[in-house]
């Protein structure tokens, strides 16, 4: 496909395939591109090119992820597929590929398997808003078994607080579709219709309440203090009131100037690297790790539950397990804060390569919402990653 064909005339949605190993996630990804390519909506990608996913680094963690793009009549999609189970876990916990929705692939021959459960749980924990199911390999599965698998899946989804009764379950064969079989292709189109209609349009970053993490602080003599950073979400205009949140008691200020690349602007928006001039704020009162946000939209917290992934030794992580009371640094947005880890009941220690839910208490409060990602570090070296699942205080 020609480079210039990407137009913003359709809503953009990030999705991914999740599910148990060998249930057909990558084959399905290839089948979607091949079926849509026939309608001029995608560039066909074969199994091999998706399976040999390039390695990327996100928060100091190496993850293999394949990125595929395609369109339907209604939307533009960026689709991720991971070769290995560990890559999925790392991807979902680090938010390397933030998914607006996912296609859960389940083989009709097997039904739900351990990784099926784990991926559904992770999707719930890291706030993947919506799932659609593709029941694969139905051409070689026993029809009676397929009915049972569907019932079992709906129960499993409900158990993890997804709307199990309403989620579309599309039955088909990704391999048949890839081979050009008309019935197989029809199932893929049915799946894409389900994804189009059931997975909601995401709220764009620019439409969310304003937030900018402070990266650097300096003072302009006679004018005041400037906080610089990349605007994470929303937009800000001159003379708007903001709150400065995190590390110290929350305080209010007014933005009296917005600067970008040495030019003065009327407004800054999500994605911009900007400097905000703040009225009545001393240089000593603003520091890296705080956030500047729309008043009342974010609060500072010290105690939370999180889903974490701990790096293996081969990934540059710890060589030894850690125990209850472990005290690393937690890197949120732009700064490290020391915190202590409480392990769940019955868990004695955590080995490199494990993923689990823990409770964390920070020494200083950080502006956070559920879903915020962080890195776990020891003296600047990343040893893990996590996602805030529940705020306690």
UniProtKB/Swiss-Prot annotation:
<comment type="function">
    <text>GTP hydrolase that promotes the GTP-dependent binding of aminoacyl-tRNA to the A-site of ribosomes during protein biosynthesis.</text>
</comment>
<dbReference type="InterPro" id="IPR000795">
    <property type="entry name" value="T_Tr_GTP-bd_dom"/>
</dbReference>
<keyword id="KW-0251">Elongation factor</keyword>
<dbReference type="Pfam" id="PF03144">
    <property type="entry name" value="GTP_EFTU_D2"/>
</dbReference>
<dbReference type="InterPro" id="IPR004541">
    <property type="entry name" value="Transl_elong_EFTu/EF1A_bac/org"/>
</dbReference>
<dbReference type="GO" id="GO:0003924">
    <property type="term" value="F:GTPase activity"/>
</dbReference>
<feature type="region of interest" description="G1">
    <location>
        <begin position="19"/>
        <end position="26"/>
    </location>
</feature>
<dbReference type="InterPro" id="IPR050055">
    <property type="entry name" value="EF-Tu_GTPase"/>
</dbReference>
<keyword id="KW-0460">Magnesium</keyword>
<dbReference type="InterPro" id="IPR005225">
    <property type="entry name" value="Small_GTP-bd"/>
</dbReference>
<dbReference type="InterPro" id="IPR009000">
    <property type="entry name" value="Transl_B-barrel_sf"/>
</dbReference>
<dbReference type="InterPro" id="IPR009001">
    <property type="entry name" value="Transl_elong_EF1A/Init_IF2_C"/>
</dbReference>
<feature type="region of interest" description="G4">
    <location>
        <begin position="136"/>
        <end position="139"/>
    </location>
</feature>
<keyword id="KW-0547">Nucleotide-binding</keyword>
<feature type="region of interest" description="G5">
    <location>
        <begin position="173"/>
        <end position="175"/>
    </location>
</feature>
<comment type="subunit">
    <text>Monomer.</text>
</comment>
<dbReference type="InterPro" id="IPR041709">
    <property type="entry name" value="EF-Tu_GTP-bd"/>
</dbReference>
<feature type="binding site">
    <location>
        <begin position="136"/>
        <end position="139"/>
    </location>
    <ligand>
        <name>GTP</name>
    </ligand>
</feature>
<feature type="region of interest" description="G2">
    <location>
        <begin position="60"/>
        <end position="64"/>
    </location>
</feature>
<dbReference type="InterPro" id="IPR033720">
    <property type="entry name" value="EFTU_2"/>
</dbReference>
<keyword id="KW-0648">Protein biosynthesis</keyword>
<dbReference type="GO" id="GO:0005829">
    <property type="term" value="C:cytosol"/>
</dbReference>
<feature type="binding site">
    <location>
        <begin position="81"/>
        <end position="85"/>
    </location>
    <ligand>
        <name>GTP</name>
    </ligand>
</feature>
<dbReference type="GO" id="GO:0005525">
    <property type="term" value="F:GTP binding"/>
</dbReference>
<dbReference type="InterPro" id="IPR004161">
    <property type="entry name" value="EFTu-like_2"/>
</dbReference>
<protein>
    <recommendedName>
        <fullName>Elongation factor Tu</fullName>
        <ecNumber>3.6.5.3</ecNumber>
    </recommendedName>
</protein>
<keyword id="KW-0378">Hydrolase</keyword>
<feature type="binding site">
    <location>
        <position position="26"/>
    </location>
    <ligand>
        <name>Mg(2+)</name>
    </ligand>
</feature>
<dbReference type="Pfam" id="PF00009">
    <property type="entry name" value="GTP_EFTU"/>
</dbReference>
<dbReference type="InterPro" id="IPR027417">
    <property type="entry name" value="P-loop_NTPase"/>
</dbReference>
<feature type="domain" description="tr-type G">
    <location>
        <begin position="10"/>
        <end position="203"/>
    </location>
</feature>
<keyword id="KW-0963">Cytoplasm</keyword>
<dbReference type="InterPro" id="IPR031157">
    <property type="entry name" value="G_TR_CS"/>
</dbReference>
<comment type="similarity">
    <text>Belongs to the TRAFAC class translation factor GTPase superfamily. Classic translation factor GTPase family. EF-Tu/EF-1A subfamily.</text>
</comment>
<keyword id="KW-0342">GTP-binding</keyword>
<dbReference type="GO" id="GO:0003746">
    <property type="term" value="F:translation elongation factor activity"/>
</dbReference>
<feature type="binding site">
    <location>
        <begin position="19"/>
        <end position="26"/>
    </location>
    <ligand>
        <name>GTP</name>
    </ligand>
</feature>
<dbReference type="Pfam" id="PF03143">
    <property type="entry name" value="GTP_EFTU_D3"/>
</dbReference>
<feature type="region of interest" description="G3">
    <location>
        <begin position="81"/>
        <end position="84"/>
    </location>
</feature>
<dbReference type="InterPro" id="IPR004160">
    <property type="entry name" value="Transl_elong_EFTu/EF1A_C"/>
</dbReference>
<keyword id="KW-0479">Metal-binding</keyword>
